[in-house]
Amino acid sequence: MNNFKENDEKSTFGQYAELDKILDLKKGIPEDPCSLQYYFDQMAMCLTVFSQMNHYYRYGEYNRCKGNFKDFKWCLSTKSKAHEEAQEGLRKRRLQQWMKFRQGPNSEDIWKMRTSPKSSE
């Protein structure tokens, strides 16, 4: 399957959603600045009793919330940088997060996309 489209128009199909995201990152569309309040809230939510019990039930251990704290620290570090440098850092980080997410297991590992309707037998 071809991973890159030749034209710049947006695709309406789900299989090209990740490609559209890459194209947006390449075009230099300004990133929304990271919100300290959002990352702080995510970190605080991770530490709640309900979240910890839910994680313990699913994985057999408590969540140390390292990823949430790391995200909060990273967002805090962007606030002291110049606007252009912060924008470039945001673009790179979002692209890295997206690539890491895509490399993990997903439904495409199990299901094959149909190109024609299933024949009724």
From Swiss-Prot:
InterPro entries: Pants/Emi1-like. GO terms for cellular component: cytosol; nucleus. It holds the Pfam family PANTS-like. This is Uncharacterized protein C227.17c.
